[in-house]
């Protein structure tokens, strides 16, 4: 079986160093597939002067194609969209057929010579018909890590799904939304959870749970963006600091908000669409969220909050190992990578009860849930854990066990192989 993974047309896709979650996912899965005698993997990515157009690494062949005029065309379309200020548009620029059309057409044409069985694309449903047009015998897998299929124009998505043989989502939360909206395609939808690296237990720094002298450290890992609920976390910090004056909060992640069009503009959830107040309107959408967060901090809290910024993924593990609790206050979350990363390192989690995170955390066993946007409840659950080291340790151990059972890269690869085999063996 030969699988072609078609990367989203941005990011590095460096085989020697992965940064984004999809780059990590692709590398971890493709490299494991290549360990099977009857599997080969190709990864398509955008052309980059730093890397050769074709190279191999750990059995994976990387093939890079030019974007041509794609980026100029997309910038012009985005500018036009923002000038017109479409309210609640269900087919924004990123979901249009022309979006990165040169990229996907080049991939589709190259695929004709690669003798692949499966083309595995991510999130951009408009790529599926292009692949099928030039490769009618190729099976197309659409991997969704967001809610776009249930948020974008229903008729447009329905037509595109005709070119998709299997829809794989990162959580049952996403899968069920797609099945409810498109019942005719329900049997083509399934869930394959994300995976995580699980360090040796000797590397997880469990002695922190026995120390009463060290300052307690809270950790947030993710984009500093309105939908991640960082404003609720900082509001909760006032009560947390009052109860535990020695606490520190590390906020690790890029301080650039998610594009307004990608989520807030198309969401049917009033809590999420209400985040539009954090975005400016007009031709240029100034990102004011990070500045507003820093301005909201009172002095007694400000010196307890550390904005670390973006760090290489390999270095994030160090933050987990020196943390006591992970907090994820997201208002929208398809899965919750930070939860399984923290749990893999034996750390308890305090998370909002939203999206795919409800399938990861077991309330009262591996951490605590709180209702999204409830800063008081967030503070209460966090303080409970901070004041109880035995509870932190037992929940951390339970979380690590849960990750070992459900969220290993080996599980991901085996689940995918099962789906691949099913559609390849099925009759058209």
Give, region by region, the residue ranges found by the protein language model.
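A short, well-ordered alpha-helix in the C-terminal region of glycosyltransferases
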Residues: 377, 384, 391-406, 415-418
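Carbohydrate-associated surface elements
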Residues: 173, 195
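Nucleotide-activated donor-binding/catalytic signature segment of Leloir-type glycosyltransferases, i.e.
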Residues: 262-310
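Aromatic "clamp/platform" in nucleotide-sugar-dependent glycosyltransferases that forms part
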Residues: 331
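Short hydrophobic beta-strand element within catalytic cores of glycosyltransferases
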Residues: 348-351
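Conserved donor-binding/catalytic core segment of Leloir-type glycosyltransferases
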Residues: 168, 210-228, 234-238, 249-257
């Amino acid at each position: 079986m030969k699988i072609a993974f078609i990367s989203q047309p941005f990011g590095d896709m460096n085989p020697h160093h992965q940064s984004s979650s999809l780059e990590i996912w692709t590398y971890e899965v493709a490299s494991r597939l290549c360990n099977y005698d009857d599997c080969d993997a190709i990864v398509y990515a955008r052309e980059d002067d730093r890397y050769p157009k074709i190279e191999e690494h750990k059995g994976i062949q990387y093939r890079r194609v030019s974007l041509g005029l794609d980026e100029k065309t997309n910038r012009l379309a985005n500018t036009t969209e923002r000038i017109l200020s479409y309210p609640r548009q269900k087919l924004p620029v990123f979901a249009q057929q022309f979006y990165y059309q040169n990229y996907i057409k080049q991939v589709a044409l190259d695929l004709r010579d690669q003798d692949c069985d499966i083309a595995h694309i991510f999130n951009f449903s408009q790529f599926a018909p292009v692949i099928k047009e030039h490769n009618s015998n190729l099976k197309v897998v659409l991997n969704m890590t967001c809610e776009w299929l249930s948020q974008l124009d229903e008729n447009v998505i329905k037509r595109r799904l005709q070119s998709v043989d299997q829809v794989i989502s990162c959580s049952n939360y996403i899968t069920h939304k797609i099945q409810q909206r498109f019942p005719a395609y329900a049997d083509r939808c399934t869930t394959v959870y994300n995976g995580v690296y699980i360090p040796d237990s000797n590397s997880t720094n469990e002695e922190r749970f026995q120390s009463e002298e060290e300052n307690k450290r809270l950790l947030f890992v993710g984009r500093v963006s309105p939908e991640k609920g960082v404003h609720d976390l900082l509001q909760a910090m006032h009560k947390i600091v009052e109860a535990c004056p020695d606490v520190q909060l590390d906020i690790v992640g890029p301080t650039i908000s998610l594009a307004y069009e990608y989520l807030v503009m198309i969401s049917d959830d009033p809590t999420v669409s209400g985040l539009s107040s954090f975005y400016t309107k007009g031709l240029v959408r100034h990102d004011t969220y990070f500045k507003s967060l820093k301005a909201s901090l009172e002095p007694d809290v400000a010196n307890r909050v550390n904005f670390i910024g973006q760090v290489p993924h390999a270095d994030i593990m160090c933050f987990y190992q020196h943390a006591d609790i992970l907090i994820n206050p997201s208002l929208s979350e398809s899965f919750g990578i930070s939860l399984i990363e923290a749990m893999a390192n034996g750390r308890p989690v305090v998370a909002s009860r939203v999206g795919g995170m409800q399938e990861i955390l077991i309330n009262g066993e591996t951490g605590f849930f709180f209702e999204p946007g409830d800063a008081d409840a967030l503070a209460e659950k966090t303080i409970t854990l901070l004041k109880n080291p035995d509870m932190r340790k037992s929940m951390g151990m339970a979380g690590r066990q849960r990750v070992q059972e459900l969220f290993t890269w080996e599980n991901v690869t085996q689940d995918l192989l099962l789906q691949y085999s099913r559609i390849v063996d099925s009759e058209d």
